[in-house]
């Protein structure tokens, strides 16, 4: 076979669309087996709920199961570190969040991974405010009454969060500093155990993402006193924002999907496309909206910029509050 014939044949095949770049073939072959989506919190919390919604729809789109695995610990650091050190082959992903990526690491003296360099941040999923909830038999019927009670009885009231470094934890620290109240923080390894103890009467209050809080409030099991968003939540228009009562106390939790650094670009690009398609579907927009969440269909570049902005935004706040989780 002559060199000229080979070259001519290759050009003809390429023109016919029978040849594709190696990367395209790589992406088409992926995934060949099930994918693990690591949730660095226990079952039952906001991260877990959103992960399971995404896993079901991503699995349908990718034609392979996306299996949620819960790996809690150290305020979401353990599970996230597990993914950072996993094979960069697209088969182990993580639900990235405030506590593990930004601004959580700013509150720690050391981290086992670099939140920027050790991951490919594939896409954002969405954001939502935290809700400040109490059990139904709590004497405080409003946020004003809770703050008044806290001021009258310094150190006697407690509140929980899903763990040190989480958005709920940071909201609580900001509230204590700005409102000048002395409350005891009780950290948990995830939302599920904290909600159980709140319902059981072991806690006074809980900062929890509205994704999880909404169901408990609508069912009448817990009472929502305030939210951390800049504006009132549409689902609960009579519930005030914290910033209405204590100026400057606001913030939102966020979720994204990330892979280990060095995961091949064709794989991360395929995942990005599927995640964004899921988020832009009418079904998912409605489902997340019903949970009090704002979908944020950002690609990898926008997600990285968002994370870097979160670092800049919260760094001075954390420094002023002298927040350290280790």
Task: Describe every region a protein language model picked out.
Residues 22-24:
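N-terminal signal peptide c-region/cleavage motif recognized by signal peptidases
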Residues 26-117, 156, 181-204, 297, ...:
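N-terminal (or domain-start) structured segment
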Residues 101-110, 176-178, 205-237:
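A ligand-binding cleft/hinge motif common to bilobed small-molecule-binding domains
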